Amino acid sequence: MKVTSLDGRQLRKMLRKEAAARCVVLDCRPYLAFAASNVRGSLNVNLNSVVLRRARGGAVSARYVLPDEAARARLLQEGGGGVAAVVVLDQGSRHWQKLREESAARVVLTSLLACLPAGPRVYFLKGGYETFYSEYPECCVDVKPISQEKIESERALISQCGKPVVNVSYRPAYDQGGPVEILPFLYLGSAYHASKCEFLANLHITALLNVSRRTSEACATHLHYKWIPVEDSHTADISSHFQEAIDFIDCVREKGGKVLVHCEAGISRSPTICMAYLMKTKQFRLKEAFDYIKQRRSMVSPNFGFMGQLLQYESEILPSTPNPQPPSCQGEAAGSSLIGHLQTLSPDMQGAYCTFPASVLAPVPTHSTVSELSRSPVATATSC
């Protein structure tokens, strides 16, 4: 089986009501772009940067490529479960042959060919989402912010009718649902989840750990609250806060409480803290911690820098298991202090580690004394 290119007109024909059930559309754009606007009925393939680097254009497990369990089970049935076509798209590429090796679309196409050898045909959309949206916007879900004009028109209706107009406000996917349980006392979610007192009450949350740029104490007046200001940037130092975050979570646990860890979207910073907690307290390897959390909140995707810091953290806190260095890593690591770290990594993570930029993998300074911790830019209650 091979990849076949198709244009927007052909995809539109596939998406006709009577044919839509036999077509699966996989959107390989970043999650936030997908959440804002997408082909109606499509699924987002949210491949983590570590998975992409490790794959190097090769195949990965079907659970990464087909995150929706129902769609995955259907496609993996004999004969593709009645699906005739799987269409892969990115932002705007015109030729699948020219896709970069580390691109999500390239990895998805390769993986589909490997896991669906006798199943539905695999297509690549020429021109990507940009072109398709410009030609057939009626086939897309376009989420736009509420404009000032719309607000004014609603106010006018209120004044004319004497009663408010029901406004169904849109919430992006990362704010939908509620916080997810990582452990019986540890929950993960977004800033929106943390602001909804009914969510917190229903889950018996007693503490909030906010890992974002802005402090928000909407529901914090009756909860234990800790704020760790961290930018979602590959240059941000989040590892220096691992231990204080772990101590706060443990303090809540020891008192029989429950803590919600959140950032803005619950995609990068707060999952990083939860992974560090699992690695420290449950002795999970990074891959195990990532998969464990991904199964519970599918859109998690820590940035390059945070994954690099987690890899370094793994080598510091978990028993080292010396392994021979892969030849491909020797050149990059030559003369570098990273050799010691590389030898302690589990074999399936060594390839991913070697592909990180040196600037990301440079040792991150950590606080080692109580006096140093007191100088960190953390706003927190005096106790947990």
Curated annotation (Swiss-Prot):
A motif (Nuclear localization signal) lies at residues 53-74. GO terms for cellular component: cytoplasm; nucleoplasm; nucleus. Pfam families: DSPc, Rhodanese. Keywords: Hydrolase, Nucleus, Protein phosphatase. It catalyses: O-phospho-L-tyrosyl-[protein] + H2O = L-tyrosyl-[protein] + phosphate; O-phospho-L-seryl-[protein] + H2O = L-seryl-[protein] + phosphate; O-phospho-L-threonyl-[protein] + H2O = L-threonyl-[protein] + phosphate. InterPro entries: Dual-sp_phosphatase_cat-dom (IPR000340), MKP (IPR008343), Prot-tyrosine_phosphatase-like (IPR029021), Rhodanese-like_dom (IPR001763), Rhodanese-like_dom_sf (IPR036873), Tyr_Pase_AS (IPR016130), Tyr_Pase_cat (IPR003595), Tyr_Pase_dom (IPR000387). GO terms for molecular function: MAP kinase tyrosine/serine/threonine phosphatase activity; phosphatase activity; phosphoprotein phosphatase activity; protein serine/threonine phosphatase activity; protein tyrosine phosphatase activity; protein tyrosine/serine/threonine phosphatase activity. Residues 178-319 form the Tyrosine-protein phosphatase domain. The active site is at C263. Residues 19-141 form the Rhodanese domain. It is an enzyme of class 3 (hydrolase). SUPFAM superfamilies: (Phosphotyrosine protein) phosphatases II, Rhodanese/Cell cycle control phosphatase. Its EC number is 3.1.3.16, 3.1.3.48. It is found in: Nucleus. GO terms for biological process: dephosphorylation; endoderm formation; ERK1 and ERK2 cascade; MAPK cascade; negative regulation of MAPK cascade; peptidyl-threonine dephosphorylation; peptidyl-tyrosine dephosphorylation; protein dephosphorylation. Belongs to the protein-tyrosine phosphatase family. Non-receptor class dual specificity subfamily. Dual specificity protein phosphatase; active with phosphotyrosine, phosphoserine and phosphothreonine residues. The highest relative activity is toward ERK1. This is Dual specificity protein phosphatase 5. It comes from Homo sapiens (Human). The gene is DUSP5.
